[in-house]
Design a protein with these regions (language model features):
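C-terminal interaction segment
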Residues: 2-30, 35, 47, 65-70, ...
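Acidic-basic catalytic patches of nuclease active cores, encompassing PD-(D/E)XK
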Residues: 31-59, 66-79
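Short Pro/Gly-enriched beta-strand edge/turn motifs at strand-loop
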Residues: 58-61, 91
């Protein structure tokens, strides 16, 4: 029986354990917003048609994309992959995301514009890859190499969103519908929400469900449940019923 030579090739390629997981010289201006906004996206990315164990969300994580240039990577501010195990090989937290090892490319990437990376994020740089041994730009990687279906940039200073959807002609403007950018594969949309997150009031990017309801964070769900319980307790008191007494009687019945 003949052996498939591709098996040896895959074994020879590095995995996430073999590749660097950080680069202190990576351009961009890390700031508090670059922590909070990706976190809110992560907490609200809850597709109904995928279980939590079939989703991986990365933030400021090395994304290795070329098996012929195994040291080349991009570092998206936020990206999501569906149809892949939450844990690497179903057992370990990821150090990086290595596309040739995982076998699945991201569904969507979000970049938060910074002065040092804005031109590259928006596809305004001239390098297209393999010029003088330089790696290709983010735009080239996302559009041509990985062919990521959805790409979105967000400027925290102007609150401007620039969104693109992959077509046969490459990335084309991705128009908002009902004040959001619909992602068919996960039956959710991205929208701009004005509110308070982590004590900060501003416009944030966050996910909405197919009924256009904002998907709540765990903290928001807990607060909503507390408010519901408080309203119920107040109503019971209006009817002359002590809600605390009900708890005591239930314990005595047990």
């Amino acid at each position: 029986m003949q052996t498939d030579p591709r098996q040896f090739l895959k074994k020879a390629l590095p995995t996430m354990y073999d590749l660097p997981s950080e680069d202190p010289e990576e351009p961009g201006l890390p700031d508090e917003f670059h922590d909070l906004q990706p976190e809110l996206l992560r907490l609200t990315f809850r597709p109904e048609n995928y279980s939590a164990q079939e989703i991986f969300v990365g933030s400021d994580l090395n994304l290795y994309y070329d098996s012929n240039q195994t040291r080349w990577y991009k570092r998206p501010d936020w990206f999501a992959v569906v149809g892949v195990s939450r844990l690497y090989k179903k057992e370990d937290l990821r150090l990086s995301y290595v596309v040739w090892d995982e076998g699945v490319s991201p569904l969507i990437v979000v970049e938060l514009l910074s002065p040092g990376t804005e031109n590259e994020d928006l596809g305004k740089t001239l390098i297209t890859g393999n010029q003088g041994g330089q790696p290709p730009t983010k735009w080239t990687v996302y559009e041509q190499i990985l062919q990521i279906p959805y790409y979105l940039t967000f400027d925290r200073y102007t609150s401007q969103v620039q969104a693109y959807q992959l077509t046969e002609r490459g990335y084309q403007p991705w128009e908002a519908q009902n004040q959001g950018w619909w992602v068919e594969e996960v039956q959710m949309s991205l929208g701009l929400w004005e509110g308070q997150y982590d004590g900060i009031d501003r416009l944030w990017l966050r996910w909405r469900d197919r009924k256009q309801n904002w998907i709540l964070t765990p903290e928001e769900r807990a607060e909503k449940e507390k408010q519901r319980a408080d309203r119920l307790a107040a109503r019971m008191r209006e009817l002359g019923i002590d809600p605390n007494g009900l708890d005591d009687s239930a314990m005595n019945d047990e």
